[in-house]
Amino acid sequence: MNLNATILGQAIAFILFVWFCMKYVWPPLMAAIEKRQKEIADGLASAERAHKDLDLAKASATDQLKKAKAEVQVIIEQANKRRAQILDEAKTEAEQERTKIVAQAQAEIEAERKRAREELRKQVAILAVAGAEKIIERSVDEAANSDIVDKLVAEL
């Protein structure tokens, strides 16, 4: 092998080139590569965190939905109980009103019955007096008296 000055010069130039690249070119390239690796790692970590946050949000939403459904069920049950209570109160009130109206109607019927009896008594008394007057006027005849009494009984 022949070592001449050209090979030696090329070797020195290559070594200087490598040294220059290692000193001035390689560090910015490595910094850019490391920066990019860090950005990618941060992006992946951020995506993982976002995925976990999404899972937590889904779980939280599911829990809140279950709680909301339970609350809705409780509210519906309370509304049904209140509806039943209102219906019972309305039935009770209607029953009381019916009882009151029936009692009032019976009282009115009884009052009308008493008034009718009193009116009937007055008419009977008037008829009895009229019959007595006729009997007194015709008291001479026994057959006429029994005829007047029969007519009076028929009128009553």
Curated annotation (Swiss-Prot):
SUPFAM superfamilies: F1F0 ATP synthase subunit B, membrane domain
One annotated GO molecular function: proton-transporting ATPase activity, rotational mechanism
Gene3D superfamilies listed in its UniProt record: F1F0 ATP synthase subunit B, membrane domain
Main subcellular location of this protein, as a coarse class: membrane
Protein's membrane topology: Single-pass membrane protein
Subcellular location: Cell inner membrane
Ranges annotated as spanning the membrane: 11-31
Any one cellular-component term (Gene Ontology): proton-transporting ATP synthase complex
Top-level division of the source organism's lineage: Bacteria
Key words, A-Z: ATP synthesis, Cell inner membrane, Cell membrane, CF(0), Hydrogen ion transport, Ion transport, Membrane, Transmembrane, Transmembrane helix, Transport
Record carries keyword Ribonucleoprotein: no
InterPro entries given in the database record: ATP_synth_B-like_membr_sf, ATP_synth_b/b'su_bac/chlpt, ATP_synth_F0_bsu_bac, ATP_synthase_B_chain
Subunit structure: F-type ATPases have 2 components, F(1) - the catalytic core - and F(0) - the membrane proton channel. F(1) has five subunits: alpha(3), beta(3), gamma(1), delta(1), epsilon(1). F(0) has three main subunits: a(1), b(2) and c(10-14). The alpha and beta chains form an alternating ring which encloses part of the gamma chain. F(1) is attached to F(0) by a central stalk formed by the gamma and epsilon chains, while a peripheral stalk is formed by the delta and b chains.
Biological role stated in the UniProt entry: F(1)F(0) ATP synthase produces ATP from ADP in the presence of a proton or sodium gradient. F-type ATPases consist of two structural domains, F(1) containing the extramembraneous catalytic core and F(0) containing the membrane proton channel, linked together by a central stalk and a peripheral stalk. During catalysis, ATP synthesis in the catalytic domain of F(1) is coupled via a rotary mechanism of the central stalk subunits to proton translocation. Component of the F(0) channel, it forms part of the peripheral stalk, linking F(1) to F(0).
Family listed: Belongs to the ATPase B chain family.
Protein name according to UniProt: ATP synthase subunit b
Organism, as annotated: Salmonella gallinarum (strain 287/91 / NCTC 13346)
